[in-house]
Structure formats: structure tokens, C-alpha cells
Amino acid sequence: KGRRLIHAIVTHPDNHKNLDNLRLENIKISDMPNQMTNAKLEKLPLVAYLGFSVHGDEASGTEAAILLLHHLAAGTGDEINEILKNTILIIDPMFNPDGRDRFVNWVNGNRGVVPTTDLQDREHNQPWPRGRTNHYLFDLNRDWLPVTQPESEGRVKLFHHWRPQFLLDVHEMGANSTYFFQPGIKSRINPNTPQEGIDLTYKLAPFFAKRLDDIKSLYYSEESFDDFYYGKGSTYGDIHGSVGILFEQASSRARETDSNQGKLTYAFSVRNQYMATLGAVDGLVALRNEFLRYQRNFYAKSSEVASKNKVKGYLINLNKNRTRAQMLVKTLQRHRIEVYDLKKSITIKGKRFAKGDAIIIPTNQPQTRFIAGVMEKVTTFEDSLFYDVSAWTLPLAFGVDYYEVKQRPDAFLGARINDINIDGGKLIGGKASSAYLMPWDRYYNPKSLYRILNAGIIPRLTTAPFTAMVNGQELNFKRGTIVIPLVQRDADATITPNMVHALMEKLVVEDH
């Protein structure tokens, strides 16, 4: 909808004056970990990314974020100064602005003067699509990995711009629950997450508990939710040397609601979220050095981790489903994965790939754990119960042809590809004299067909294989090829042959 995604950066005025230099120093923790001594780390503030309400109708997180911003901006005293000096807090109050708007507009448009807890009241019954998803009806808390949505694209870009040591993901759950904070169920953790990161989660938990104890709110931990899928906010940080934490507050879904513990108010939900988030900040200040050292060690051990992996690289075939293969590579690059052209031919499983036929991804690079987490095929787990997502191998999701490389790929690495471009199509034979033929074998064929129809052209669909002379050469075409006539039979048609020529030249460039 063209609206900006907003976030606030909260830190001490002295840090604000030197903010970009502090960001660059923070990036060195992952880029040059062996140069970041403990003495250097002790001089750096911890960077934390605090995100709220990725599901728009789990609204209390946003209100808690506003309270936190006010507390940190307006507060004075030693405690506030200690927080601001030792942390750089990236606060995103609305992970999902469109979903939140749907929810807020429904509640405000259907509530009465007197609050009601009756679950049959209109205020409590949003119609489809509700507020959980974004404008395109996508669950943004499953999109940190595939990055298909504009909100996710901006969020992942911001994450890697700063590379925080901590990522908070604030949610709501059923009204009959209390308050959940991680750690989750011990046996349901992705094996690529280091034990040291899990240990830090356990060290943080008492800080959440203390703040909730202060206001006598009930809570629990370790009894639900998993950490398998790296496409959720609470787990995405785990595979980047950060610690991801999930908060879940019992939801009133409106100003107040009935629960098996009596009346639950929105104000109560906001208070719990605010206090637990303060607990997170308390813990980050107290454990700052441990978090910074953990991220440094996470990346310092990358080569060691890669050496233990039997897979030394992944090869992605560009000759099959080329557009989808390029889109996969583009997605991997969003997560700081290094990809390379082939320097020379390589043969894998009897298939020969020449330079230009494939892209190769070595596992010996800083993001080696992430590569394993999204490229390997895992079919057995210590605990086979999943919260929801149970498969996340990205090449399979994109439907591309890829291979494990078991030999060291150094000799085959060509130039590094910093930003892959999706290829354009080809217009073979120049201007058509009768019709254009569009084989149905490219990812964006449906987009092109829509634009052809929208221009007023009535194309035809072939129902059997055939041959045709193109540019003096006989070519074979499969069933499903689209025939785009130059002259329209429709007497009311206004599109001319020159307009058809111009559209075809445009489509091969823009729709690949």
C-alpha cells in the first residue's frame, strides 16, 4: 500500500552520535570474529531487535512497545542510563501494520459504549480474513526464511544491516492460557542451533519471571512451542549467532473477554507484555558480554563446523526451472549467503555442468549453519511433534534441481555473484508475420498471459504437440503452447499488429 515500515532506534545520546561506527563495529563480530577480542567486545553495546504483533489481531504487543518507548525516552535515573549506555534497541512496534489495521478497525467499528465479554458479540467475531495475515493474506511469522512479502524483505534487510545479538518476537495466544516465555520444549529444537545459544535462553528466563512476579502475573515455560523452523521470528535469530525469544500472552482479542479464570482485559495483556519486555532488557544489560561473546564465537567456529559437514557445497542447476533457480539464489543472498559462478566444468552423479550452467554454494563460509539449516534434507528428529511447519528445505520449496557436492569445491569456484539478476526471455525470429508462440515452460508465463488478455488479445491454447517454422528452422512445441495472433478476429478489437509486436518485445524483457 506504499506505507513506510517504521522502527525506532533507542540508545544513549553518546551512542546516537556514533551510531554508524557502532553498527560497523558490531558487524565485525560476524565478519571478522577472530579480531574481536574480549576487550574490544566489552566496549560495545549489545544490539537487540524487539519486534511486536506480527499477527495483527495479537495487538497488545504494539501497545507494550509504545509504553517501552515512552519509558526509555522519558525515564531518568541510573537504571535508564545503564540500559541506554549498554544497548542499542531496535524497536519495531508493528511487524504487521495491515493486519493490525484490519483488527483495530473491526473492534473500534463494532464495539459498544459499555465493554462486553460476550464472545457472541460482534466485537469478538472478526470476519475472514481477520487480522492475522498481512495485506496479501500471508502469515508473516512463517516468512523470515522464504522472504516472499514486502514486510519480510524490509525486516530481514534491517536484521542483517545491524546483525543483533537478540531478537524478540511478541505474540498472543488463547484467552484461557497465562503467559509463556521461552525456553520451549527441550526436545524440539533445530539441531543446527548451538547449545550455547540455548543456554543463554535459560539464563534470560529468570529476568522475565522476576518482572512478572513483581506484578503477581502467572506464567509458564518449557511446556509448549518448538524451535525447529528458522522462518519464525523467535527462531530466525538462533541461526545467526543471536538468541531468539518468543513471548505469548493470553489474548482478550478486544477490550475484555471471558476466560476460565474470569474476565481478561486488554489493559492486563498490555501490562504483562510491557513488564516481560522490561525483563528482557534487564537480562540483556546483565548478560551483555555473554551475548556479544556468544555471537563472536558462533562465527569464529564457522570453518570448524563446515569441516565436520560431509557436504562441502551445493550446486544449483540453472538449466532446469531457470527462473525459480535464480529466485532461490536471490532468496539465499538476502540471508548473506555467498554464491559463486562455476569456474570450470564439474560432473556430479553423471551429469556434467559447464560454466554458466549452475551456481555453486560452498558450505565453508560464515553462514555455514544457516546453509545446513535450509539446504539439508532432515527426515528424523529426536522429537517428531511439530507446532506446525515440519519441512523447510528451500530448494524443494522452489522446485529446483540441486545437488550435494561432497568434494572441496574451491577449484570450481568462479567469481562471486553479489546480486543475481533474473534473466529475460528471448524473442526468436524477430517480428511475427502471423502469430507469436509462447511455450508454457517459464515461471512468469501466467503473468505474461494475464497481460496479453488485459491488452485485448484473445490467444489460443494448443492441445497437442506440433512443429512450426521459426526463422527458417523447424521447432518442436509442446502441448499447452500459447498462440498469440497478430490480427484479432473480434470485430470490436482495437489492438493493431504493431501494438502486438510492441507488447511481445516488452514481455520478453519484463516477464522472463
Q: How should these model regions be labeled?
A:
Residues D118-F138:
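Aromatic- and acidic-residue-enriched carbohydrate-binding clefts of CAZyme catalytic domains
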Residues G99, A175-N176:
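Short, active-site-adjacent cap segments at secondary-structure transitions
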Residues W106-E123, L145, P164, Y202-K203:
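Active-site cavity-forming subdomains of large catalytic enzyme subunits
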Residues K1-A59, E63-I90, Y136, R142-D143, ...:
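Intrinsic-disorder/low-complexity accessory segments
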Residues L69, N86-G109, V114:
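Carboxylate/His-rich catalytic cores and anion/metal-binding grooves
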